[in-house]
């Protein structure tokens, strides 16, 4: 059996945010390349020849749909940044506050729709599937907009806002209720002057499995928690097989996902970054296309003149 590229035993699997990659014995293989190209015609040649395309997406794709990113200036909920609340320690200390934060995010998403970037990816996947080619989306986003756009081959490595996990019995279940429990109705306002609701724990979302009734938590990966090893193995298989990789709307500072594309690039596979600005990983990639993904991706993923037509 071949060794995994990103298996937990060889690389970090814990969710964390860093400006520089973690030290590892393999880091020396990710050599800095020549300045990446922004030549769309050259990228389109790679796209036309690719049989297995991996697309790694981050918050920048959904930002164009109006989804808060909780990054940079103005990236606060009340006086907190996401990294202050998206931790197991924060949930243990104040589950009411954390549930208010996620209730706000769930409610925001009800009015958001996929943008042209999401749709370009989904349409490309469907079109290439009919040609016997594969597109897989590996997303760090928890908003389900790729799913809503129609993407089928989807790995949501950080989970989703619309699933819960019981802290007692471990049951994972879809949950699209609005509000998720009566006590959260009208709660979660993001303004800094808003006071915490201080909802009693027994009024927060509870497990409905027979005989359980345990406290529910969002089924997302929090900072300091490990990603699901089974999902990491799926990611590894896809990245080991891909012959073209796109990195779209991601800052390349949240690990372990920030390692994925540089590892693909280290074996000579073309990697194209689509982002508003450069990232710590940009110089490792063959292509970089600045600008909104909703503008660059439709052109990049449009049918190529060499594609079969029905």
Curated annotation (Swiss-Prot):
The note on the cofactor says: Binds 1 zinc ion per subunit.
Upon changing residue 158 to Y, the result is: Loss of enzyme activity
Instruction: Enumerate the Pfam families for this protein.
Output: SIR2
Q: Which GO terms describe its molecular function?
A: NAD+ binding; NAD-dependent protein lysine deacetylase activity; protein-glutaryllysine deglutarylase activity; protein-malonyllysine demalonylase activity; protein-succinyllysine desuccinylase activity; zinc ion binding
The UniProt entry annotates the active site at 158 (proton acceptor)
In this chain, NAD(+) is annotated as bound at 58-77, 140-143, 249-251, 275-277, 293
Residues in domain Deacetylase sirtuin-type?
37-307
Tissues where this protein is expressed: Detected in brain, liver, heart, kidney, lung, thymus, spleen, skeletal muscle, intestine, pancreas and testis (at protein level).
Cellular component terms (Gene Ontology) = cytosol; mitochondrial inner membrane; mitochondrial intermembrane space; mitochondrial matrix; mitochondrion; nucleus
Q: Where is the transit peptide?
A: 1-36
Source taxon at top rank: Eukaryota
Q: What is its main location?
A: mitochondrion
GO BP field: negative regulation of cardiac muscle cell apoptotic process; negative regulation of reactive oxygen species metabolic process; peptidyl-lysine demalonylation; peptidyl-lysine desuccinylation; protein deglutarylation; protein demalonylation; protein desuccinylation; regulation of ketone biosynthetic process
**Enzyme Commission number:** 2.3.1.-
Alphabetical UniProt keywords = Cytoplasm, Metal-binding, Mitochondrion, NAD, Nucleus, Transferase, Transit peptide, Zinc
Q: Where does Zn(2+) bind?
A: 166, 169, 207, 212
PROSITE patterns recorded:
SIRTUIN (PS50305)
Q: Where in the cell is it found?
A: Mitochondrion; Cytoplasm, Cytosol; Nucleus
Q: What happens when the gene is disrupted?
A: Mice are born at an abnormal Mendelian ratio with the number of live-born pups reduced by 40%. Surviving mice display a global protein hypersuccinylation and hyperglutarylation in both liver and skeletal muscle, while global lysine acetylation is not significantly impacted. Mice display elevated levels of blood ammonia during fasting, but otherwise are metabolically similar to wild-type. No overt phenotype observed in mice on chow or high fat diet, suggesting that Sirt5 may be dispensable for basal homeostasis under these conditions.
Q: Which residues form a coiled coil?
A: none
UniProt family annotation: Belongs to the sirtuin family. Class III subfamily.
Q: Tell what the record comments on domains.
A: In contrast to class I sirtuins, class III sirtuins have only weak deacetylase activity. Difference in substrate specificity is probably due to a larger hydrophobic pocket with 2 residues (Tyr-102 and Arg-105) that bind to malonylated and succinylated substrates and define the specificity.
Subunit structure, interactors included? Monomer. Homodimer. Interacts with CPS1. Interacts with PCCA.
Q: What does this protein do?
A: NAD-dependent lysine demalonylase, desuccinylase and deglutarylase that specifically removes malonyl, succinyl and glutaryl groups on target proteins. Activates CPS1 and contributes to the regulation of blood ammonia levels during prolonged fasting: acts by mediating desuccinylation and deglutarylation of CPS1, thereby increasing CPS1 activity in response to elevated NAD levels during fasting. Activates SOD1 by mediating its desuccinylation, leading to reduced reactive oxygen species. Activates SHMT2 by mediating its desuccinylation.
Q: Any idea what this protein is called?
A: NAD-dependent protein deacylase sirtuin-5, mitochondrial
Q: Which gene encodes it?
A: Sirt5
